[in-house]
Curated annotation (Swiss-Prot):
Keywords: ATP-binding, Ligase, Magnesium, Manganese, Metal-binding, Nucleotide-binding, Purine biosynthesis. One of its GO terms (biological process) is purine nucleobase biosynthetic process. InterPro entries: ATP-grasp, ATP_grasp_subdomain_1, PreATP-grasp_dom_sf, PRibGlycinamid_synth_ATP-grasp, PRibGlycinamide_synth, PRibGlycinamide_synth_C-dom, PRibGlycinamide_synth_C_sf, PRibGlycinamide_synth_CS. Transmembrane segments: none annotated. This is Phosphoribosylamine--glycine ligase. Its EC number is 6.3.4.13. The gene is purD. It comes from the Bacteria. GO terms for molecular function: ATP binding; metal ion binding; phosphoribosylamine-glycine ligase activity. It holds the Pfam family GARS_C. Binds 1 Mg(2+) or Mn(2+) ion per subunit. ATP binds at residues 135-196.
Length: 428
C-alpha cells in the first residue's frame, strides 16, 4: 500500500525510514519532508505543507494512499484527521477535539483534575494582575506555561520571583507567544526525573512504546532555556516495571477512558511527559498528541515491530491483537543544532561530513535540512540533525553517537555533550 507521512522534522524522517522497512509498504511519501527524506531511496518528498489540509487530502486521494501517519501537532490541532476520516481515508492520529490534550494546556489541566490523574497543582489565568498575585502568593520556583502551541518553547521554569513575574507579563501583557500565550497556566514546580511515556491508542486499546528520556534545556547539565529537545535515549531506567505499571494505571488508562467518556474518543500516538518523584510516583507535566521529537529517533532505531502494521491496527481498533518488539540494546540520539538556537539562528549553511552510506547500528536523521540548488544539504532550522546510535549500554550508545557526530560540521554547529548522563550515572 502507499503511505503518506505528514511533517518535515527528524521525527518524520525516522517514521518514514521505519515504515519503509514494512513488507506492507509500496510507496512512501513525506509531505513536505526534508533533505534526509529526499535522499532516502525508499522515500519521496511531496511539496505540500503539513498544515495544507486540502492539499494533503487531494494528494492522498489521487495517489491511492492506504495509510497516513501524522508527525507534528499543528495539522492535528486544525483537524487533518477529521478531514481524512470524512473522506473515508485511514489516518493514524487524534481528531481536532481530542488533540486539545496538546493544543490547550488549560484544557489538559482541567481534564486531569476532573479525572483525578496526578499532576502539579495549578491555576489558569487570562488577567495579568490575578496571575501576578497568585505567583506572589505561591513563590518561586514556579512554572509558567503558555496555553496554546508554542513549538515546545512556551514553558518557563522560573527559579526566582522576578523571573516568574517577567514570564507572566511577557505572555499576558507582552504577547511573547501571540495567541498561544493569551491564557496561561501557572503551576507548582515538581522535583524528580522526567520521562517520555509514549503509547499507541485505537480509541479503546493501548499499546505502549519503548520509554525514553528527552533533554529539554539547551545547555549541558540541563542549563539555559527550554528547547524542542536536544537529545534523547531509550529506554529510560527511571521507568522501572513498577513505575510503568503505575503510569498505565494512574495516567494512561484514565486518560483514554476519560476522553472517551467525554465524547472525545482518542486514537493516535499519545505522549505523556512525566515527572517521576524519588518514590516512583508519576505526575503528568504535559500531554502531546504525537510521537516526541527527538524521542522518535532512538525509539525507531530500537523498534523491531512493523510500524505500518501497528498504525493500521490503530486505525481499525485492533491494537489489542498486537504486541511491540524491541531491540534489547539502548539507543541514544544527539541533536546537532544551529548556532544561536533556540533564539535566532542562521540558515542555509552547507553541512559537511554526512555519512555517505548506511552505518551499522546508527543513523543520522535529518530535521531542519533542505537541498539547495547545487543538491547540497544545507541547514534549514534550529534543530538540524539527530545522530542516533545503539550500544550494549547507554554509555556505549552515547560514545558511538558522539563519534558519528564528530565528523559532521557546518558554521556554528553545536550540541550538548552530556546526553544520557542520568542513565549513565545509574550505571546503565
Amino acid at each position: 500500500m502507499n503511505i503518506l507521512i505528514i511533517g518535515n522534522g527528524g521525527r518524520e524522517h525516522a517514521l518514514g525510514w521505519k515504515a519503509a522497512q514494512s513488507p506492507l509498504a509500496d510507496k512512501i511519501y513525506v509531505a513536505p519532508g526534508n533533505a534526509g527524506t529526499a535522499l532516502e531511496p525508499t522515500l519521496e518528498n511531496v511539496d505540500i505543507a503539513a498544515t495544507d489540509i486540502a492539499g494533503l487530502l487531494a494528494f492522498a486521494q489521487s495517489h491511492d494512499i492506504g495509510l497516513t501517519i501524522v508527525g507534528p501537532e499543528a495539522p492535528l490541532v486544525i483537524g487533518v484527521v477529521d478531514a481524512f476520516r470524512a473522506a473515508g481515508l485511514a489516518i493514524f492520529g487524534p481528531t481536532q477535539a481530542a488533540a486539545q490534550l496538546e493544543g490547550s494546556k488549560a484544557f489538559t489541566k482541567d481534564f486531569l483534575a476532573r479525572h483525578n490523574i496526578p499532576s502539579a497543582e495549578y491555576q489558569n489565568f487570562t488577567d495579568v494582575e490575578a496571575a501576578l498575585a497568585y505567583v506572589r502568593q505561591k513563590g518561586a520556583p514556579i512554572v509558567i506555561k503558555a496555553d496554546g502551541l508554542a513549538a515546545g518553547k512556551g514553558v518557563i521554569v522560573a527559579m526566582t520571583q522576578e523571573e516568574a513575574e517577567t514570564a507572566v507579563n511577557d505572555m499576558l501583557a507582552g504577547n511573547a507567544f501571540g495567541d498561544a500565550g493569551h491564557r496561561i497556566v501557572v503551576e507548582e514546580f515538581l522535583d524528580g526525573e522526567e520521562a517520555s511515556f509514549i503509547v499507541m491508542v485505537d480509541g479503546e486499546n493501548v499499546l505502549p512504546m519503548a520509554t525514553s528520556q528527552d533533554h529539554k534545556r539547551v545547555g549541558d547539565g540541563d542549563t539555559g532555556p527550554n528547547t524542542g529537545g536536544m537529545g534523547a535515549y531509550s529506554p529510560a531506567p527511571v521507568v522501572t516495571d513498577d513505575v510503568h505499571q503505575r503510569v498505565m494505571d494512574q495516567v494512561i488508562w484514565p486518560t483514554v477512558r476519560g476522553m472517551a467518556a467525554e465524547g472525545n474518543i482518542y486514537t493516535g500516538f499519545l505522549y505523556a511527559g512525566l515527572m517521576i518523584s524519588a518514590d516512583g510516583q508519576p505526575k503528568v507535566i504535559e500531554f502531546n498528541c504525537r510521537f516526541g521529537d527527538p524521542e522518535t529517533q532512538p525509539i525507531m532505531l530500537r523498534m523491531r515491530s512493523d510500524l505500518v502494521e501497528l498504525c493500521l491496527a490503530g486505525t481499525q481498533g485492533k491494537l489489542n491483537e498486537k504486541t511491540s518488539d524491541w531491540d534489547e540494546r539502548p539507543s541514544l540520539g544527539v541533536v546537532l543544532a544551529a548556532g544561536g538556537y533556540p533564539a535566532d539562528y542562521r540558515q542555509g549553511d552547507v553541512i559537511h561530513g554526512l555519512p555517505q552510506q548506511e552505518v551499522k547500528d546508527g543513523k543520522v536523521f535529518h530535521a531542519g535540512t533542505k537541498l539547495n540548488g547545487n543538491h547540497e544539504v544545507v541547514t534549514n532550522g534550529g534543530r538540524v540533525l539527530c545522530v542516533t546510535a545503539l550500544g550494549e549500554t547507554v554509555a556505549q550508545a552515547q560514545q558511538y553517537a558522539y563519534q558519528l557526530a564528530e565528523g559532521i560540521q557546518w558554521e556554528g554547529v553545536f550540541c550538548r555533550k552530556d546526553i544520557g548522563y542520568r542513565a549513565i550515572a545509574r550505571g546503565k
